[in-house]
From Swiss-Prot:
Xref: InterPro entries: MFS, MFS_dom, MFS_trans_sf, Multidrug-R_MdtL
Cellular localization per UniProt: Cell inner membrane
GO CC aspect terms: plasma membrane
Signal peptide per UniProt: none
Underlying gene: mdtL
UniProt protein name: Multidrug resistance protein MdtL
A Pfam family annotated for this UniProt entry: MFS_1
One Gene Ontology molecular-function label: transmembrane transporter activity
Keywords recorded for this protein, A-Z: Cell inner membrane, Cell membrane, Membrane, Transmembrane, Transmembrane helix, Transport
Residues exposed to the Cytoplasmic side: 1-3, 63-68, 114-130, 179-216, 268-270, 316-327, 378-395
Parts of the chain that traverse the membrane: 4-24, 42-62, 69-89, 93-113, 131-151, 158-178, 217-237, 247-267, 271-291, 295-315, 328-350, 355-377
High-level lineage: Bacteria, Pseudomonadati, Pseudomonadota, Gammaproteobacteria, Enterobacterales
NCBIfam families xref list: PRK10473.1 (NF007782)
Membrane topology, as annotated: Multi-pass membrane protein
C-alpha cells in the first residue's frame, strides 16, 4: 500500500510545482525572451489549458490501457516540456512548453486519483485525500523559496532543469515502484452489477459532488488569483508582507488538512462537508462586513480552513461510485474544476467585478448551492454497492 501512496503523492505534486516554481524567475524570463511580464502571465492559463486537454483523454486511456502507462508517459512529457521551456529563446516557444507541461501534469493528476480509488475504500480514501491536500498546500510555499535559492547562483533555466528532474523521478517511480491497479476482473457476484455501462457519469450523486468540488476549487483559485490585489493594493501590504500572509494561510490549510483524518474518526463525512461550506459562508459574510485588515485576514483564513476540511471528503465521495471507470471519473472532475474555476474568474474580469466582490460572490454562491446539494442528494444503495476496491489488480 505504501508504494501506491508514494506514487500517487509524487504524481499529484507535479501539478502545483509546475505552477509555482517558475514564478520567482518571471522578471528574468521576460527580459531574456524580450516579452513583458504581463504577456508571460498567460503562461498560467496556458498551463491549465494543457491540463484540461490531457484530462479529456487520460482518464479513458487509463481505464482501457492501465494507470501505469499513462503515469509514465505523463511524467516523460512533463520532463521533456520542462527542457523545452529551458531552451526557449522567444515567448511563443516558452508558452508551447508550458502547454505541454500542463499536458504531462494533467495526465499524472488523473492517474493519481484513479490509483487511490482502485486501492482504498471510502473511509481510508477520504483520509488520504485530506492528507494529500495538506501536502499539496506545502508546494505553493516551498516552491518559490526553492526557486529563489536556485536563482541566487544559477540562471532561470535551472528552474526548469529542476522541474525536468522532478519529471524523471516521478517517471522512475511509476516505472519501477508503481504496480498496475486497473481492475482486471471482478468477483463473480459483482459481474451483474459492476460494468462500465452501469457506472454512468450522469447520476445525481456524482453530479452533485462534481458541482460541490468544482465550486470549492473555484473558491480557492479565486482567492489565489485575487490575493495580490486584495493584500497589496487594497490593504496596502508590501511584497514581503504578502509573502508572509500567504505562507500563514498555507500553514492553516496544512494544519486543517492533516487534522481532517482524525476528525473523520469522530464525525461523519457529511458533517465535515457541512462544516466546510459553513466556513465558506462565514468567510463570505465576514469579508462583506469587514472594515479593518484584521477582520479581512480572519475571513481569508476561514477560506483556507473551509477548503481543507471538505475538499478531500467530497472528492472521495465523487469517486466512490466508480470501480471500473475511476480514470474517466477523475478526468471529469479535473476538467470541471479547471474549466469551471477559470470560467468564473474570466466572467468576473469581463464584467468588471472587483477582486473582493468576486471572492465574496463565489463564497456565498458556493456555500448555498453546496449545502442544498449535501442535504438533498445523499448516497443511495447503488453508490454503496460500487464502493469497493477492485477484486484483482495486476502485479
Amino acid at each position: 500500500m505504501k508504494r501506491f501512496l508514494l506514487c500517487s503523492f509524487a504524481l499529484v505534486l507535479l501539478y502545483p510545482a509546475g505552477i509555482d516554481m517558475y514564478l520567482v524567475g518571471l522578471p528574468r524570463i521576460a527580459a531574456d525572451l524580450n516579452a513583458s511580464e504581463a504577456q508571460l502571465h498567460i503562461a498560467f492559463s496556458v498551463y491549465l489549458a494543457g491540463m484540461a486537454t490531457a484530462m479529456l483523454f487520460a482518464g479513458k486511456i487509463a481505464d482501457q490501457s492501465g494507470r501505469k502507462p499513462v503515469a509514465i508517459v505523463g511524467a516523460l512529457v512533463f520532463m521533456m516540456a520542462s527542457l523545452l521551456c529551458s531552451r526557449a529563446s522567444e515567448g511563443s516557444l516558452f508558452l508551447s512548453g508550458r502547454f505541454l507541461q500542463g499536458v504531462g501534469a494533467g495526465g499524472c493528476y488523473v492517474v493519481a486519483f484513479a490509483i487511490l480509488r482502485d486501492t482504498l475504500d471510502e473511509h481510508r480514501r477520504a483520509k488520504v485525500l485530506s492528507l494529500l491536500n495538506g501536502i499539496t498546500c506545502i508546494v505553493p510555499v516551498l516552491a518559490p523559496v526553492v526557486g529563489h535559492l536556485i536563482m541566487l547562483r544559477f540562471p532561470w533555466q535551472s528552474l526548469f532543469y529542476t522541474m525536468s528532474a522532478m519529471g524523471i523521478i516521478v517517471g522512475l517511480l511509476s516505472l519501477f515502484i508503481l504496480r498496475e491497479t486497473r481492475p482486471v476482473r471482478l468477483a463473480p457476484r459483482d459481474l451483474s452489477r459492476s460494468s462500465p455501462a452501469a457506472e454512468s457519469l450522469i447520476n445525481r450523486f456524482f453530479v452533485s459532488r462534481l458541482a460541490i468540488t468544482t465550486l470549492s476549487v473555484s473558491v480557492i483559485l479565486t482567492f489565489v488569483n485575487a490575493s495580490p490585489v486584495l493584500l497589496m493594493e487594497v490593504m496596502g501590504f508590501s511584497r514581503g508582507d504578502y509573502a508572509i500572509t500567504m505562507a500563514l494561510t498555507a500553514g492553516v490549510s496544512m494544519v486543517v488538512s492533516f487534522s481532517t483524518p482524525f476528525a473523520l474518526g469522530l464525525f461523519k463525512p457529511r458533517t465535515l462537508m457541512l462544516v466546510s461550506q459553513g466556513l465558506f459562508l462565514t468567510a463570505g459574510v465576514t469579508l462583506s462586513l469587514a472594515h479593518t485588515n484584521t477582520v479581512t485576514l480572519f475571513g481569508l483564513t476561514l477560506i483556507c480552513a473551509g477548503f481543507s476540511v471538505g475538499f478531500g471528503v467530497a472528492m472521495s465521495q465523487a469517486l466512490g461510485p466508480f470501480s471500473l471507470r475511476a480514470g474517466v471519473a477523475s478526468s471529469t472532475l479535473g476538467i470541471a474544476q479547471v474549466c469551471g474555476s477559470s470560467l468564473w474568474i474570466w466572467l468576473a474580469a469581463i464584467l468588471g467585478i472587483s477582486a473582493m466582490n468576486m471572492l465574496i460572490g463565489i463564497l456565498i454562491g458556493c456555500s448555498i448551492v453546496s449545502i442544498l446539494l449535501i442535504f438533498s442528494v445523499t448516497p443511495n444503495r447503488s453508490v454503496a454497492e460500487h464502493e469497493e476496491i477492485p477484486y484483482q489488480s495486476r502485479p
